[in-house]
């Protein structure tokens, strides 16, 4: 290895090291802060403390922690499951089926990505209010069931699915849904894993829409509960960081369970 190559590799490793520290430090600081009192967090203490149990006791006494946690998990799992089914069917159909109008429809779907969700909140709220969907899982789920990004990801990956296999399956008498569920889905585990992690994370962290339609304390989610901990006068940062730490647990579990396919799915979706 030449001197220039060694210097280049050294610089690359230094850059990767700095990037890793910058990425990991906020997570580590959050864990440390969850074990300390608020005054220690404000003072910049960077060592583990012994106040996690006290923070937990204060949290459960002031907020409906576990009902909010289970609400978030329930809504998020429902959104993820239905979004994967709807978006994968749409992406598959846009790529596999031949129709003169499909490209125009697909263009409209992609153009909708340019509309910020904030601009749609008021009309959606009025519509859901008249339909009686406020404070309900259905009302929380519907705006996330068919996102343009997921449809685009599934369509891009459907390009790699051999059309000859589909034609052969049709000749053998397999239905269209049979082709999709028995052939397409098993061969596209990577993109489903990537889409699942993306959808799960977005749904779990969905604060704005949840705040808009979930006015009942029995239906509030973790982001809403965390916002209740932030006060204009006194904020217990140790308790706040513990709540944030608990919120990250479901996403971490899903990511590590699907990490085998996650990177492959992300790289495949941008071919």
Language-model regions: role of each:
Residues 2-271:
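A structural signal for multi-pass alpha-helical bundles of membrane permease subunits
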């Amino acid at each position: 290895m030449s001197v220039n190559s060694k210097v280049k590799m050294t610089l690359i490793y230094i850059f990767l090291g700095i990037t890793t520290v910058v990425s990991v430090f906020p997570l580590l600081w959050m864990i440390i802060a969850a074990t300390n009192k608020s005054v220690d967090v404000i003072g910049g203490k960077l060592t583990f403390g012994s106040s996690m149990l006290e923070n937990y006791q204060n949290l459960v006494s002031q907020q409906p922690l576990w009902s909010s946690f289970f609400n978030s998990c329930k809504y998020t799992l429902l959104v993820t499951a239905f979004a994967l089914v709807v978006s994968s069917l749409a992406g598959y159909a846009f790529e596999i089926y031949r129709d003169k109008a499909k490209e125009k429809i697909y263009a409209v779907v992609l153009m909708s990505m340019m509309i910020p969700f904030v601009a749609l909140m008021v009309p959606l709220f009025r519509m859901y209010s008249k339909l009686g969907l406020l404070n309900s899982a259905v009302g929380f789920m519907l705006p996330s069931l068919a996102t343009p990004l997921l449809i685009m990801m599934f369509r891009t990956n459907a390009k790699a699915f051999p059309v000859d296999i589909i034609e052969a399956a049709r000749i053998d008498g397999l239905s269209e849904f049979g082709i999709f569920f028995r052939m397409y889905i098993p061969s596209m585990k990577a993109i489903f894993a990537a889409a699942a992690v993306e959808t799960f994370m977005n749904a779990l962290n969905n604060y704005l829409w949840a705040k808009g339609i979930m006015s009942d304390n029995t239906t509030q989610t973790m982001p809403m509960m965390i916002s209740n901990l932030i006060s204009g006068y006194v904020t217990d940062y140790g308790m706040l960081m513990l709540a944030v730490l608990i919120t990250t647990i479901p996403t971490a579990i899903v990511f590590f369970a699907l990490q085998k396919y996650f990177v492959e799915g992300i790289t495949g979706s941008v071919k």
